[in-house]
Amino acid sequence: MTKPRRGDVVLVLFPNSDLRTAKRRPALVLQRDGLASGLPQIVIAMISSNPLRAGHPSRVSLAAASSEARAAGLRLDSIVMTDNLATVIETEIDSVLGRLPDMGRVDAAVRHTLAL
């Protein structure tokens, strides 16, 4: 598999907040392309299909019927959670499901989350 790029939606074993358990789920690659940190890892944001997680400025909702969600490979209504980030080793990424065509709303959510 080629290295995932910023904006790719990937299937990955995403660590839970307790750092003891994890769940295979989609996630969005946030890390800039060509970061060249010397480490084989990628910064990602969790994607949830739980509608109760929507409605916060740190989160971006994607309706399953939208062209955005279809391009990203998301079959369910989904929420990109920029307030739930993880750094994972590249080998933990199973596959690229698709690509989010426009990162503008996600970038705004990241700025809100990190006070940038």
Residue ranges, per PLM feature:
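Conserved functional hotspots at enzyme active or ligand-binding sites that engage polyanionic ligands
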Residues: 1-116
